[in-house]
A protein has these predicted regions:
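PP2C/PPM-type serine/threonine phosphatase catalytic domain
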Residues: 1-304
Length: 304
């Protein structure tokens, strides 16, 4: 599968925060058109050195991915090696002044096997097709999202919920590899010319709704102007806000990769087809058992 990209665009804004704790890779507003992967991390506020955590993860992933041949398939095992290296980098940075540093992660990579999307926390990934709308939206690892899924809250009640900043997964330096939160990983071959992939920290989501995002991306404006408008809407956010917009120029598909992706259930080892938001995806998800204390006390970006 040969996926060719248009020029990607990014913004990286401090909002109404005193410090910038978001990081991105590559750290430029208009990267080289040969760039095949994109990362946005949001350092966990209220904890030690969130900006160090987000930058460390971005730099580690950038280093690991520099050795990848994107003309080959980038497997879930390959991604797990990249993620492990990022955790190792966090461990290496750990000291008495930043023992609790942590960050979210969003990652998108285009390769011969399709597109791999991965996230930890509440930074988000969208795949939007102008003719159909949102094909995929990552499912936030957050307290309120869990409450919505369990029927405790309605989506409307969740919007301004007082625990809206509590996340249930995050990347941090831990004492054991067994305690590392793993990512939700999606692989899709349903990629078409004109598709948009949008990845962002949650500060962007404070300023723009899904409907507004779709409206902007489906407009007749050029990609640079679309991203400029999203940045303008986000610049007065109460939070740091960072995003990447990547559009698909052309896709050449061979018969093998055009087949539906499948998911293997790690518990039953049964192979079954799944469909998420109108596209066939492969999901490999390993959920960290987060303690009650960890869930309730990790408040993102709470400085007071």
């Amino acid at each position: 599968m040969d996926i060719r990209l248009n020029q990607a665009y990014s913004f990286h804004q401090i909002g109404h925060r005193e410090y910038q704790e978001d990081s991105r890779f590559p750290d430029v507003d208009a990267p080289n058109q040969e760039q095949r992967f994109f990362v946005v991390c949001d350092g966990v506020g209220g904890c030690d050195k969130g900006e160090v955590a987000s930058q460390t993860v971005c730099e580690s992933i950038g280093k690991s991915m520099s050795r990848v041949d994107f003309e080959d398939d980038f497997t879930n095992e390959d991604f797990n090696h990249v993620l492990d290296a990022a955790y190792d980098a966090l461990d290496a940075k750990r000291n008495s002044s930043n023992r609790e540093m942590a960050t979210t992660l969003t990652f998108v990579c285009f390769h011969s096997g399709g597109c791999t999307m991965a996230h930890i926390g509440d930074s988000r990934i969208y795949q939007i097709r102008p003719s159909e709308g949102i094909l995929y939206r990552s499912d936030d690892h957050s307290m309120v999202n869990t409450m919505v899924h369990n029927g405790v809250l309605t989506p409307e009640q969740a919007i301004n919920h007082p625990q809206g900043n509590v996340i249930t997964r995050y990347m941090e330096s831990v004492d054991s590899d067994q305690n590392r939160c793993m990512a939700t990983v999606m692989r899709t071959v349903d990629v078409a010319t004109g598709d948009y992939f949008f990845i962002c920290s949650d500060g962007v989501l404070h300023s723009i709704t899904d409907d507004e995002l779709v409206e902007i991306l489906c407009s007749d404006a050029c990609d640079e102007d679309k991203m400029r408008l999203i940045a303008h809407k986000s610049e007065d956010s109460e939070d740091n806000n960072t995003a990447y917009l990547v559009s698909i120029a052309e896709v050449y598909t061979d018969p093998v990769t055009a087949e539906s992706a499948e998911m293997e259930d790690e518990d039953t080892h049964e192979t079954k087809k799944i469909k998420v938001a109108s596209q066939n995806l492969e999901e490999i998800e390993s959920i960290q058992n987060v303690s009650d204390n960890g869930i309730w006390n990790w408040l993102k970006k709470m400085f007071n």
